[in-house]
Amino acid sequence: KNSIKKSFKYLNKMKKSENDYSKDGALEFWSSGGLMQTIEPSGRPETYDYVNINPKHIEVIVLAKGKAAVAMYYSEGNMKPKNSSEVSHYLTRVSQTFVKEDGEWKTRTSHWSPVMGGSGTTQTGKE
């Protein structure tokens, strides 16, 4: 839970995602409904004009103690990705798989899907 909260604090402050991805990269489905995205170990490149998103109701299921876990939570707020449309009520369900590498939890998979009454991101690619 703390890794997720820390990642969102970084996102909101720096207006870009923290590089918390596995050394093997990750696969993601984004809330825009597009195709699967391959994320390189260097992380997601997008930046935001503004972003204020927070995780809520985080639940973690341990798959292998100290090695792998799945987190499920909601992500809510607003954002304006650079070169994309504003999302005034971003509200998604999130499922993420984490692996422990060099003592740190790293993202291996993510699936973001909009919740009824909210919207997903307007981004459809990694540009």
Summary of predicted features, one role per range:
Residues K1-D20, S119-E127:
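Short, low-complexity N-terminal intrinsically disordered segments enriched in polar/charged residues
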Residues I4-F8, I39-S42, S95:
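Extracytoplasmic/secreted envelope proteins and their assembly/folding machinery
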Residues E18-N54:
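Short solvent-exposed beta->alpha transition segments
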Residues E18-S31, A68-M79, T97:
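Short, well-ordered beta-strand segments in beta-rich or mixed alpha/beta enzyme
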Residues E40-E86:
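Surface-exposed, charged secondary-structure patches
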Residues K56-A64, W112-M116, G125:
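Glycine-rich beta-strand-turn "strand-cap" elements at beta-sheet edges
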Residues K82-S88, G117-Q123:
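A short acidic/glycine-rich loop-to-helix N-cap element
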Residues L91-G120:
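Short beta-strand edge/turn micro-motifs at domain boundaries
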